[in-house]
């Protein structure tokens, strides 16, 4: 997994502690289920109490998932690139759950491309990376349920949160 991906989005301090992810599993999409990793991710989100993520890529279907979770009172914090923010805002304006999104979603904008896509919750950490050719790898994701793995993910999130600025959703 690691050798096939661009690790430049992971800070050096985090790379030194990558052993915290040793109990992880790789979720791979297969020809009979090309959305295996994404489907698993959405299912896992449904049981989360807190969701924090970094997203330099955009999956429109995910905004509906976040809106439904926000409507249930789940607190969501996302660090996104400006391009992803613009796409999210355009779709959010059309969402019937727009008010719930505003109440329970905090968006932070980062100017640099993090080159890593991940979510950390109260019970799992899931990360996707870009391939060495620069394209995002939608088919392989690394998933950890361990305390060490989620702790590693929280530290990575804090790194990117510190490099971002909050966007005011009260538009």
Question: Model segments located where?
Answer:
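Residues that form generic nucleotide/phosphate-binding pockets
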Residues: 44, 100, 156-160
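A structural signal for well-ordered alpha-helical scaffolds and beta->alpha junctions
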Residues: 34, 38, 90, 146, ...
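Residues in well-ordered beta-strands of folded domains
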Residues: 27, 79, 108
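Cysteine/selenocysteine-centered motifs that mediate thiol-based redox chemistry or coordinate metal-sulfur cofactors
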Residues: 155-171
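Primarily the HKD phosphodiesterase
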Residues: 41-96
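HKD-type phospholipase D/PLD-like phosphodiesterase module
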Residues: 82-123
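Interdomain hinge/linker segments and adjacent boundary elements that couple functional modules
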Residues: 1-60
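HKD (HxKxxxxD) catalytic microenvironment of the phospholipase D
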Residues: 106-150, 157
